[in-house]
Each structure stands twice: as structure tokens, then as C-alpha cells.
Amino acid sequence: MTIVKISDVGKGLNADLTPEELQMGVWSDARNMRFANGYAQRFNGLAPIFAAPVVEPYYITAFQKPNKRLWIHAGTERVFSDDESVRTEITRLAEITISTLTHVTTTATLKTSAAHGLTTGNSVTIYGAYPLQYNGTFTITVTAPDTFTFTMASDPGADASALGHLTGPSAATANFTGTRDDRWTGGVLAGIQVLNNGVDVPQYWTGDANKLRTLPGWNAGWTAASLRPWKNYLIALDITKSGVRNPHMIKWSVAAVPGSLPDSWDETDVTRDAGELPVSDTADLLVDALPMGDVLIIYKERSMYALRFIGAPYIFQLQRIPGDSGMLFRGCAVSTPLGH
């Protein structure tokens, strides 16, 4: 038998091809070994990073804080964070719908769309309102079954243009309503985790003691099949508004201030840079998006587009990529040094 010298044996493992089809240096099987940087190395084994999850996870991602790393995992109904020693449920809380939010100097009057069930002395939390003085945790004085007042730290100077969201002192957990087929999407923008399951309103989490919360400026009657952070924006695809699906619509937020999420998605506000764009020159539906260098690749079922930031007044430019390839389902592409 002729002895053949193989100088490079660290090209990796390929279990899909038969041994006869492999090039020199590629292995058909390996146990307790890994390949990195052209070398074959002994593998030290695996160790669990946290105990068995409470729910069957259909989404998992690492969330980096300055002092530690958290693992966020989501089932169909509940979401948890785990720092490898303590597991915390961060599923959203039930909210009370705000109908009006007005002020006289530093005294705010909040009216709910139905009886709120609160009493004087209760502590409530408001977030996502604008001006920002309306946000925070306040002790209230009830003046009617659907109305209460509270004192702000300073005068907001105007009634609330964005009503925000209200949670009471004993708000119950509000489970999500997706199924296994409603794949979670999201990412990190400005150090804040965003999550979206396509059937409930998108959520965010800041990595603190708060639970998941509704995105600022997002209309309660909207959903998005996919939500991805890109540059200083959040990009949403396949938008449903008040029950009407727009499967060819791309929608983007205003640019985020560093350290904060975008506060508006209002495409009709000509003073801001939020907007919408149809991708309707092909019949296939929008699926997902993934950055590639300085562009965002928008995937439909059988076509691809490049979204580029060009600034005011159009903000983004959309260009068709030649070919008839697309994406099978959300999350079915990854970034590599050679592309997707």
C-alpha cells in the first residue's frame, strides 16, 4: 500500500459527503476533536450553562451587559433571562389602556378607556409616553372610576402626544399568544434587547428588574412578521394594521438616540424620519432581513433586495438584487465572511 502524506489535516469535518468525495485534509467523522485555524485539536467537552429551562425554548440569544452576560430564552408564551446562576421571568405584564393624558403644570390627569380598578395611594408605572415627564412610577389620587391624577417632577409643557403604557401595582403576567410556527425575531439596538413573535406587539427589555415592555411609539393595533435592528433604526417587515395584512411593506422607526430606543414609527410626521416602503414588484412575500456590510438584505420568498441608508428626504433606498433566490423562513440565513 502506498503511503500518502497529507500535510494539512485541519480543514474540518464534513459528514454529508462520502469519504471518497472529500478533499485531502477533510474528515468524514471525528470524536472528541474540533478543528480551528487549520489545526485539529482535542475537544474538552461540553458543560451546561444553565439548568433545564422552564419552558421549551424556541428562541435563545445572548444579551451582553457591562458586568455579565445573560441568556434570553423564549417559549411560545413566556420569556426568561438566565445569568447562569439565577433565572428570572421577564414575560410582559398586563397593561391598562390610556385614553387621555393631560396636565396643569406638574399635575397630570390620566383617563383610562375602562374602569381601572385602582385606589388612592396605589403606585403605578407609566412608560413610553411623550413628553418624557409623564414616564415613571407615581403615587396616584383616584378622582373617578376611569380617572386619576399624579404629580410629576417637572412641567412637561404640553399634554401627552404619545400616551404610552400603564401598569398597576399588582399587574398580572400577560402570556404571549404565538405558536411554535411563530418564530421569534429581534436583536439588540443601543444596548436594549428587542423581541417580536409576529402575532403580539413587539417588546423590549433593558436587562434590569423590569419585565418586557411594548416598543415606544408602536401602535397597539399593529404587528410585524419580522423585526430587526439596523444602524440606528428598527426595521419591520410584513406589517398588519388593524387586522389588514400588508405582506409587501417595510416599515422603519425614527433614528434612535444613543442609549435609547426609537420613540416614533409615525410615517406621516414630516419632521421625523420614520417611513414605509412597498416591495411589491414581485408577488412573493417578505420573510426576513439580515445585514451584509453597509446594507440590509431584505429577503422575500424568491427574491432579494438591498436596503441602503441615503439620508433625508428619502432616508432609505431599495434596490433589487438579480436572481430568483429568497429565504425559506425567518431565521434561515446567517452572516459569514463570504456573505449569507
Regions found by a protein language model. Give the residues of each.
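Recognizes the extracellular SEMA beta-propeller fold with strongest preference
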Residues: 1-95, 167-340
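Small/polar beta-strand repeat architecture
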Residues: 92-181, 211
